[in-house]
A protein has these predicted regions:
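Short glycine-rich anion-binding loops that position phosphate/pyrophosphate groups of nucleotides
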Residues: 35-39, 66, 113
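Redox- and metal-dependent alpha/beta enzyme cores, enriched for Fe-S-associated oxidoreductases
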Residues: 42-86
Length: 148
């Protein structure tokens, strides 16, 4: 496997309308810790979605789904491995940035991966670390508040 593309993705006009109602640079976008191939990719690969998000978003924050070399849920780590990508927060960040250049302003990693941020390849990235495991609703609310 060399890549994974969803070719039938199509824009939802209601989403376009909602984004346009907000005005330019009036929203913050958080890309949750979802599978970049099966969850985020089909959305970001919709024609013109990237340019629309960059035009409308004040900032885009992406949360890594990889913690300590594994995905907490789902096949993201398996897909990364099959594509020959390093299964790490750093590997995810570099792949996302290559696939969706200039989309993400701030990268959020779990504190377990903080040491990876010292890589020369990542020096120009705004990487923040915190506990990203949302084990209950109260922790999820705290994390959401921290993100915003």
């Amino acid at each position: 496997m060399h890549d994974l593309l969803i070719s039938c993705a199509a824009v939802c006009q209601r989403l376009i309308d909602l984004l346009n109602e907000r005005g330019t640079h009036e929203i913050d976008v958080v890309l949750g810790p979802s599978n970049p191939f099966l969850s985020l990719g089909p959305i970001l690969d919709i024609p013109d979605m990237m340019s629309l998000l960059r035009q409308q978003a004040r900032r885009v924050v992406a949360v890594s789904p990889i913690i300590g070399g594994r995905a907490l849920k789902g096949p993201a780590a398996k897909i990364m491995s099959e594509l020959g990508l390093p299964v790490s927060a750093a590997g995810w960040t570099l792949w996302m940035n290559e696939r969706y250049p200039d989309l993400v302003d701030t990268w959020v990693w779990d504190e377990a991966d903080e040491g990876q941020a010292n890589s020369d390849a990542l020096k120009s990235f705004d990487i923040r670390t915190t506990s990203t495991v949302m084990s209950d609703p109260a922790i999820a609310r705290q994390f959401g508040a921290w993100l915003l």
